A protein has these predicted regions:
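Auxiliary tRNA-acceptor-end handling modules of aminoacyl-tRNA synthetases
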Residues: 1-12, 58, 66-71
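Ser/Thr-centered flexible coil motifs
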Residues: 5, 181, 210-213
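Positively charged, Gly/Ser-enriched RNA/tRNA-binding surfaces
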Residues: 11-26, 37-38, 73-76, 84-159, ...
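Acidic, His- and aromatic-enriched active-site or binding-groove loops in soluble protein domains
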Residues: 50-66, 179-208
Length: 284
């Protein structure tokens, strides 16, 4: 958590204003949700490691006394601070979808909180800026999200960046074909996501530490060691070719729209840690 001096807040306001201007010009509408969420919702979400980083709010009065008497630590809190903006959006949309346009193109820029050890680049309180399109399952929605986001970045002076893209469905299909059980795929994906940080040997070691089938781990390690992991090679192990076709379409279209100002690339190890990511994922 940190304070902002007047000049720092002015810069933040300017950057946020430019980003919102780009998003609104493309038809996105801004919403706001409470910082506090019911613990029942937070705990039932599929937020990966973030579930261990929730700032919990103690119950009050008689409810707290009853919780203390129960001896169950989980009974002490009934609310917590949001750790991202996706869970609040899901709850918001479920409660209000009849009042919203279809598809719903939404902006969120708000503070989120994670109870982790502060370090460079990681704060316990920070601002997230999200855009989402709800109600459009076509690959054109993915293309639009990439296009609008990159235009926002270009508008505040960034260039020469790379948009990495993957689809968790393709990755999961490949992993299942290698012998990993369906109920272990999220765990395997989280480890595979660390490829850039710990390398192929580190990924293999961590998967073995998780006591996953050695034959499946070796199959994945051999696949990686064979050379560059291409989309065609991964897609060949996926049961549904339409998923790979959609990803190829998004890559080709996004590259054409980039017009050389930035790069768009397939990244086979890109997963994102949260389990609620089930389709295409991006990272810039």
């Amino acid at each position: 958590m940190r304070d902002l001096l007047p000049n720092e807040q002015t810069l933040r306001d300017y950057i946020q204003g430019k980003i919102l201007e780009t998003y609104r010009a493309s038809g996105f509408e801004r919403i706001s949700t409470p910082m506090l969420e019911d613990m029942e919702n937070l705990d039932k979400s599929d937020g990966g490691d973030n579930l261990n980083l929730i700032f919990k709010v103690l119950k009050r009065g008689d409810k707290l006394t009853a919780a203390l008497n129960s001896g169950d630590p989980k009974e002490l809190s009934d609310m917590g601070l949001r750790y991202d903006l996706t869970l609040p959006l899901s709850r918001f949309y479920a409660a209000n979808k009849d009042k919203l346009p279809h598809p719903f193109k939404v902006i969120q820029t708000d503070r989120v909180f994670r109870a982790e050890r502060p370090q460079k680049g990681r704060l316990r309180e920070f601002v997230q800026c999200d855009i989402d399109i709800l109600g459009d399952e076509s690959p054109n929605a993915e293309v639009e999200l990439i296009d609008v986001t990159t235009r926002a970045l270009l508008g505040i002076g960034f260039d020469g960046f790379t948009v990495n893209i993957n689809d968790r469905r393709i990755l999961r299909g490949m992993l299942e074909s290698m012998g990993f059980a369906a109920d272990t795929l999220d765990s395997v994906c989280i480890t595979f996501d660390k490829m850039d940080k710990i390398g192929a040997d580190g990924v293999k070691a961590e998967l073995l530490e998780k006591q996953l089938p050695e034959s499946a781990v070796n199959a994945l390690a051999d696949f990686i060691a064979a050379g560059e992991v291409t989309l065609d090679a991964v897609a060949a192990r996926c049961a549904d070719p339409a998923i790979a076709d959609d990803l190829k379409y998004v890559l080709a279209t996004a590259n054409a729209m980039a017009a050389g100002r930035y790069q768009v690339a397939y990244c086979p190890s890109l997963v994102r840690g949260q389990g609620y990511y089930t389709g295409m994922v991006f990272e810039i």
